[in-house]
């Protein structure tokens, strides 16, 4: 039976694949029959992801993408790609007044500069096939709303969204598509590692019309959609996946 979302025969790079959304994307891509290349900094957790992948021909490469030399070496090792899911990033809640220069540098280095340099190197080394698809994992903080403590994180994602739209124009003549996926709150297990009470969670959930937080699979399947040929006429867009949060 024909599956319009199939990634059969496509080679897809997923960054930040050692846990959470990145792991879910990698698994989903392998289930859609892609040849998956995963990368992250943590060797043990990346191996755990690798063991969950389906199919043959998958590859794992340890690399810290915030290190420009490691990033360059990674790109040189890669075959031609049909898709990129750029997921590596960090979340930091910091009030601007008490933040330091190093905080700004680290957040932008990982959330903004690393994905930009990745695509820069892929293009310069001719690693993207014609009609390839690039998907950046951004956030609703990048396109919609501010939050106390979110000035640095939100602006790092807003910069990525701006880059994505301009890049989409630059590479359109080659049929390469560029989009972002912008999730709201996704339960990646982080609530199990915090002191947030059940009452606090229930109060926060009132901000979501669909009455739940996102699942990693919600985001992974959206990325599959944008990587697949189904979305071949979609570029330069930001896909908000937030349970209706931004409607309020």
Task: Give each language-model segment a name.
Residues 2-3, 224, 235-248:
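Short C-terminal tail/terminal secondary-structure segment
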Residues 18-19:
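Conserved glycine-rich cofactor-binding loop
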Residues 95-108, 204:
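Substrate-binding pocket helix/loop in short-chain dehydrogenase/reductase
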Residues 119, 156, 164:
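Active-site helix of classical SDR
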Residues 124, 165, 169-170, 232:
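Alpha-helical segment proximal to the catalytic Tyr-Lys
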Residues 139:
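Residue(s) in the substrate-gating loop at a strand-loop-helix junction
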Residues 172, 177, 234-236:
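Short, small/polar-rich loop/turn modules that mediate ligand/substrate recognition or access, typified
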């Amino acid at each position: 039976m024909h599956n319009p979302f199939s990634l059969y025969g496509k080679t897809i790079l997923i960054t930040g694949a050692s846990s959470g959304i990145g792991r879910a994307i990698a698994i989903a891509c392998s289930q859609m029959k892609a040849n998956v290349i995963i990368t992250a900094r943590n060797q043990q957790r990346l191996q755990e992801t690798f063991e969950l992948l389906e199919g043959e021909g998958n590859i794992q490469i340890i690399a810290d993408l915030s290190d420009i030399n490691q990033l360059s070496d990674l790109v040189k090792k890669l075959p031609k790609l049909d898709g990129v899911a750029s997921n590596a990033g960090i979340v930091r809640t910091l009030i601007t007044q008490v933040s330091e220069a190093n905080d700004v540098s680290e957040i932008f280095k990982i959330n903004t500069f690393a994905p930009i340099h990745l695509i820069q190197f892929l293009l310069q080394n001719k690693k993207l096939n014609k009609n390839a698809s690039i998907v950046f994992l951004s956030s609703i903080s990048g396109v919609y709303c501010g939050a106390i403590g979110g000035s640095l994180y939100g602006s790092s994602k807003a910069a990525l969204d701006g880059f994505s739209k301009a890049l989409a124009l630059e590479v359109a003549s080659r049929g390469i598509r560029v989009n972002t996926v912008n999730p709201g709150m996704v339960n990646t297990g982080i609530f199990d590692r915090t002191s947030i009470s059940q009452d606090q969670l229930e109060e926060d959930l009132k901000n979501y019309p669909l009455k739940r937080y996102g699942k990693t699979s919600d985001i992974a399947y959206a990325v599959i959609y944008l990587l697949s040929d189904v979305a071949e006429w979609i570029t330069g867009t930001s896909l908000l996946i937030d349970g209706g949060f931004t409607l309020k």
